[in-house]
């Protein structure tokens, strides 16, 4: 016999080396949906302990971006890992469907409601537009391998959800948290609507910084408050000086505010050149800086007074014909300015609070479009930001402008329009943070939640401690109505508001939100009441829509109908970007505490934003945008999923072509490891060929033990949401424990041992156990590839890997086992040391390959005792044709030191002939009649009982 190739156990599998994921994944997706994979998972997990990850709804507008992909893939990985851990973990994806961005898109095509199109038609067009956007995003998410209730997602515009949003408002009102007030709110003049805190972002803006004089109305009364030397009361006009960066708010000024405990100085500005004599009141600490910037060099102090002494003194408005009082406020500081604060209660939260205390007029001369109202003296019809220059001109004319310069500062902007916003007092509906103890209860509930990372707790506590009332009303067309009736004269809520809300909710459940605008009040409350009450026509903040989904979705959908005793909270986990501490996490917490007295979630996990390889934000103008569709079309979704799982997503997450290439390289290593397992399981039937654990070759037992240890760590990391630890452990297992050692050592035995003999079957048993575990470790992350592996594995099995649980067939090495982990760790160290010398010998042309070598190991007694346990099988571990062990005392001069203490190695080229079958150089090659080209071991493996392997 001269061709021994057919006698080898060569690897064979239908699992290709190349993933070709971009082409193959869509075929797998089709099968998943044709065979209802998600439905199969639900059936398999029915009755198991529940795990609810509630999906924060993305906005139904535009294509998905890489941040969406990161978020949805993270959720999908966690859901799938929980499923494998034996939980019933449904996933109902959601969409936020009301609000301004959708209105703006529809306005472009159809015009503004009430002009070219009726409000009812406009709402219908918004609904159609949002539905189309949902469908587009849905297909993109499905392509990423995300499993869920895609046929029945939740949309905040679904009639049932809209009805439940209205019911949520009723519950909050019933608990005493609803408030109507005329208050300053963040107002976007482009939106023409109030904004929630979460809709405000801060950007740098250049504004005029001005110091303005308010002349004392009663000079004598003002002077009397200062401890001036007798007869030295100074000369010139007497004024307080305020500082502001919003000159446009001066028409609404109704007071100047001082701090009760601050010291104020009366400064005499001396006549000098063009400088007229005048007297200025300033905070002592700030006087020098104010005078310096006004280029006033010649001055002296006349006297001092406490802020509390100056309360209720009157000063002339700088350009209107009325006086304003000096009032006291804790918000006044000496951080900047003059120590005296211009107070316009209609244009600032602190001004409003202090104005209420002094019963000041809440002047609001600005319309919803940011233009001064027609009756605004001097400035009617001007846009407020353009009016700054006009205000400065008037101040100069009146001689009231002490100083001005351009000032760059952080200023609130609309998150949609990216334009500066204003504070504007309007009648609005609020959820009060304090009138029924909501703030205190919310802060208490924060402590009951597990925040990951931990800093999330401090962040949200700080935000809740400092936040104003939640303005929930909007002056928009496309939104859930604030379905309340108020008395036409007293503006009080109808006494039966809760019952009326339920009636409206039932109508909305049937016909959608348009029902509110269509219904006649008399139908709900009778003619008599209808004559005295009117509908509220405002809509709800979209953050309210999404914030109450713990009730409108989780508490209401059949998918989440788990036993009450399992449900400590509506959801187990909320997982979103770190910006949601001020957004969805907070709106959900506040609404849930207001409705139910407890947090809506047990755990909150946040991820960072996606940046490019240089840490820059994604931007079309920079050209660094990575689109999910481009990645899936080029590399496949599994590469994107592996990228997500490989990052420490609690910080910023970097992505670039180079980073994705690294993910693709890591993927190839894992895929090739899996392919080795599958190819070497050819001809193996688990039903008949499994070798009992106690009869397995020692090295095979060790490999299964390593898989057992890896699985424990991997499951723990999945449970703790440390996905990058999962991928690190997976890579280490595949590349180091398997690839660099075990798989390398077993190739000889696997390929050359007797087909179906104990030596081969022991090895295949280990490979089978390991791939059964490996495919499950991979499934949450590389879902497509895991499915592909699953379908190539031997033995009877369920249709999908995703319906099962972690593999239970692995075992750990028994305690006290002779060939334990410590033993194999030392053997690997010996092998690594020998390998370095083999490489050197190859470089020096002493040998061609490792199998041409014979090595002699000179070792100390302790090491010899370990190495000799492998007997003649040491050579198989070292991949050499022969390996001899001798005491250190017999070391020859040619033996070289290794990195291991107590080990020297001599490498020599074997003089024996090469076996044509196993390629080992063995002395008995050519001595066996009829088999002159092969060694005795191969003859036994081909025609005899096969070699015996105990250790390796």
Curated annotation (Swiss-Prot):
Position of sequence motif 'KMSKS' region: 617-621
Cofactor binding remark: Binds 1 zinc ion per subunit.
Cellular localisation: Cytoplasm
GO molecular function per UniProt: aminoacyl-tRNA deacylase activity; ATP binding; isoleucine-tRNA ligase activity; tRNA binding; zinc ion binding
Motif ('HIGH' region): 58-68
List of residues binding Zn(2+): 915, 918, 935, 938
GO BP term (any one): isoleucyl-tRNA aminoacylation
Catalysed conversion reaction: tRNA(Ile) + L-isoleucine + ATP = L-isoleucyl-tRNA(Ile) + AMP + diphosphate
Cofactor(s) needed by this chain: Zn(2+)
Binding site for ATP: 620
Oligomer and partners: Monomer.
Protein name per its UniProtKB record: Isoleucine--tRNA ligase
Organism: Aliivibrio fischeri (strain ATCC 700601 / ES114)
Upper taxonomic lineage: Bacteria, Pseudomonadati, Pseudomonadota, Gammaproteobacteria, Vibrionales
